[in-house]
């Protein structure tokens, strides 16, 4: 273990000597969260994180169970200063949108491996049902879950400034209590400042970011968000540009404090909270598993 960590540290330092800014990451592919490895109890993932040449550690989870993934992300996020990236997870998981939303809602990130798997490997393996990891087919055709995965990524990208800095207690993620989204669902989640009731009849996922004086709201499909515990004002649609400025693309109206959200549209709602609330955002991730 000492030999391995010394080697990682040396390589990391060498790379960081580059003339451009470099962030170094090590992927860990086996273990129980950040607990010591069963085969060598003196070896821990945090040993790698503590190396001067390594900036953060991620996990190659290869899990499609939301609760199991939640446990991994929370474990890696518990290391102060670490970015809890799911460094690799199969693109062939049908619930990829739910897995991605889970990771981001808990303060982590998510990489799909891979975009498409070569047909050569699919045809030349003893386990053909295990080798195709692509979010697309080998000939770059969409799989059934490719469009909702793309839609979720676009929503997170549109809100990227706040996705990067919001705390998990203020990232409300809807319809991820199970491994697959419910077709019909009414779900109430509280952030530290807002109470939100989400309704869908089309298996939509959704999220709300509570930024204290405004909310960012997004859903994959047309959905409703009832907003309570505050005064809610101007509502616009748009996205953050490359300079980090929210660019207005349209307007919307709240009806009885309810936003009838169009799928694939990011909304910004100005608000002031009535009183502090106890957040239950984390409890509403994988809670039925």
Predicted segment positions?
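Aromatic-lined carbohydrate-recognition surfaces of secreted/lumenal glycan-active proteins
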Residues: 1-43, 82-92
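Conserved, mostly hydrophobic/aromatic
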Residues: 15, 57, 103
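Flexible loop/turn segments at secondary-structure boundaries
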Residues: 31-36, 64-68, 93-95, 118-122
